[in-house]
């Protein structure tokens, strides 16, 4: 016995059960007539069930496991019926996790679905805006027109910047019991794949070695733990030391901050900046350029015994304290780097590649000097003097906090450095291909929110003791599907996220109660 589909002149399809007897086909029963493909599948399943029952009727003595076989057939038919009503399959594991993190921070205050999608895409699939459109379509069945995205970027920068910073600050303050006690500030450079400059994109000193590419300077203010608070964008050729004070002044004024400490690297500071910090009444901990101190201070530093992990203090007057620490590890690193630089100089000297143009203070060129009117020589006396400073690191502060706390606070600057690494390697904030100021600012705004979402998800993983990185969680989530089944009678759509055995490590992230209780 077999199932036969017979097409009528009207275009309808009859489903029949037939069998061959002595080489001739005989129709046993007509199951029904189908008017569309969906009905055909249902009638075919009914026909198979009829055949199973007919075989049991004809050969009861052979059907020792008839009831079990019949139950299995019904089970298969039920599965086929369910699968025939699947209306969509979404690869949306990342989407579900990022949505909940986005909302938990409070970014759902921004009633803007395009903004939400661009932030999530930046975390799940960081790429160009054109490729983002394809990603949204293929993974979430969401149609977003590319021209609409570009028009959206043109209007985004004007009104979202302040809102997203406000949401981020309020959420971070909540994590710290309402008080943001330490502000860490640093800058990086972001280059463009372009050959020309404009009023914003300028060539300048590149932290990425892209000195011929136009760039912008991005300043970032973060809290303890590396949670982003505020950002600023400046021309690519601006002195980075001039970017910090305006950002901090605006931030403090807006949020009425009191009793806080500013922590920054020595590269951002000069005497004018330090004086301005003090004029505003700010407390600070900054890296000190101990080799630029007065001869009296330098002599005092070099006279101090060098003990591993020990710090000494020098009172500079006016409330300023100079703290100097020494570690064996830093001493080894300083010596190694210097020796490597000297070997390069000696190699260049041997081949006659050193000229007057090399006499500058860049890197290890500081060890070069003129031998007579023309000849360039390596000054080994300077090298010997430089070695005296191996292992020493200075910190300048106007706080009265203990020495060890100053050291700990300063070395938490790695949170800013890590934030930049996340932005560049995970969120892929650069290189940028936008060329208008509005779109550049919009792109940075989206990346800032993506960084905040990344950091909050990282915190949630630690709180919930999920021993996986954000990157690994998102990679695993990309293998999670959600099926949508359209119920044939009431036309409702039933949705089910499919978590397999390998997904159990992160299963709690898909539990609504988890996001409420944490």
Model-derived regions, located:
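Conserved glycine(s) in the ABC-transporter nucleotide-binding domain "signature"
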Residues: 1-113
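Anion-binding and metal-coordination hotspots
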Residues: 2-4, 12-13, 24-25, 98-518
């Amino acid at each position: 016995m077999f199932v036969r589909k017979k097409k009528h002149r009207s275009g309808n399809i009859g489903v029949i059960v037939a069998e061959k007897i002595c080489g001739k086909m005989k129709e046993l029963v007509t199951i029904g007539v189908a008017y569309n493909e969906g009905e055909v599948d249902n009638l075919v399943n009914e026909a198979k069930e009829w055949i199973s029952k007919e075989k049991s009727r004809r050969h009861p003595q052979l059907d020792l496991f008839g009831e079990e076989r019949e139950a299995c057939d019904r089970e298969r038919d039920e599965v086929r019926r369910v699968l025939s009503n699947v209306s969509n399959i979404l690869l949306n594991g990342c989407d579900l996790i990022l949505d909940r993190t986005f909302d938990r921070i409070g970014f759902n205050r921004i009633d803007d679905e395009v903004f939400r999608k661009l932030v999530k895409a930046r975390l799940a699939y960081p790429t160009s805006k054109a490729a983002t459109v394809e990603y949204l379509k293929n993974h979430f069945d969401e149609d977003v027109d590319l021209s609409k995205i570009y028009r959206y970027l043109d209007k985004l920068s004007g009104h979202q910047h302040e809102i997203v910073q406000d949401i981020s600050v309020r959420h971070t303050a909540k994590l710290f019991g309402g008080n943001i006690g330490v502000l860490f500030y640093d800058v990086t450079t972001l280059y463009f794949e372009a050959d020309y400059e404009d009023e914003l994109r300028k060539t300048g000193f590149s932290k990425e070695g892209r000195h011929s590419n136009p760039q912008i300077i991005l300043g970032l203010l973060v809290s303890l733990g590396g949670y982003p608070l505020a950002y600023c964008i400046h021309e690519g050729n601006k002195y980075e030391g001039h970017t910090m004070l305006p950002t901090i002044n605006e931030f403090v004024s807006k949020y009425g901050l009191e009793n806080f400490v500013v922590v920054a690297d020595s590269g951002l500071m000069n005497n004018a900046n330090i004086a301005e910090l003090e004029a505003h009444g700010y407390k600070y901990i900054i890296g000190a350029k101990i080799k630029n101190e007065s001869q009296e201070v330098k002599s005092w530093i070099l006279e101090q015994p060098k003990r591993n992990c020990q710090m000494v203090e020098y009172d500079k007057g006016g409330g300023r304290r100079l703290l100097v620490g020494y570690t064996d590890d830093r001493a080894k690193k300083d010596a190694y780097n210097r020796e490597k630089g000297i070997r390069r100089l000696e190699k260049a000297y041997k081949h006659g590649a050193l000229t007057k143009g090399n006499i500058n203070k860049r890197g290890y060129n500081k060890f070069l000097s003129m031998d007579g009117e023309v000849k360039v020589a390596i000054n080994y006396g300077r090298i010997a003097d430089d070695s005296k400073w191996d292992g020493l690191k200075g910190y300048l502060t106007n706080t009265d906090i203990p020495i060890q706390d100053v050291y700990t606070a300063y070395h938490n600057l790695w949170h800013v450095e890590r934030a930049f690494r996340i932005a560049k390697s995970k969120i892929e904030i650069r290189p940028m291909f936008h060329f208008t100021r509005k779109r550049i600012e919009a792109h940075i705004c989206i990346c800032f929110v993506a960084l905040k979402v990344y950091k909050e998800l990282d915190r949630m993983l630690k709180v919930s003791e999920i021993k996986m990185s954000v990157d690994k969680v998102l990679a695993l989530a990309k293998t999670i599907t959600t099926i949508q089944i359209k119920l044939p009678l009431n036309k409702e759509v039933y949705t089910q996220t499919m978590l397999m055995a390998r997904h159990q490590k992160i299963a709690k992230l898909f539990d609504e109660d988890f996001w409420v209780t944490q």
